[in-house]
Amino acid sequence: MFFMNKESYFINLFQNQYIGDDGALLNNTVYSMDAFFENVHFKREWMSLEQIAAKSMLVNISDAIAMNATPKYALLSVAFPSSFTKDDMKELYRGFDKVAKAYGCEIIGGDTIANIKLDISVTIISQTSNPLLRTGIKEGDLIAYTGKLGESKRDL
């Protein structure tokens, strides 16, 4: 909980009308971005590289869907450990590609860098004509979710 207080504090420093939802809405385009870092969000011993890449895409795509937006494009930033082989990179690619294709999302670029562990950041660019915003929620509205709340945190 201590970190979440720091996160909220940091976000509030920007005092920006676009910050505070699952993504930033500008002219019917939703921009969302999440980091997925080794030993923070996942452990490589628990998931295959394909699963790690797929999950990093899915958590970002879910932000777009939560805002009633259709994912169109993705930008990937991947920090590779020096121990990574070409086969490891192909396995990551398969996870990214499989999810992108399943949701009709095209990977259009990004960045790579060497690192001591695997870190991934994904930006999703989505389109919506009828966005759902947190600011519009009111008492009595139906809130829906999938899975079990808190499960990702519990797993680490």
Over which residues does each language-model region extend?
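Helix-biased detector of long, well-ordered alpha-helical tracts
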Residues: M1-L156
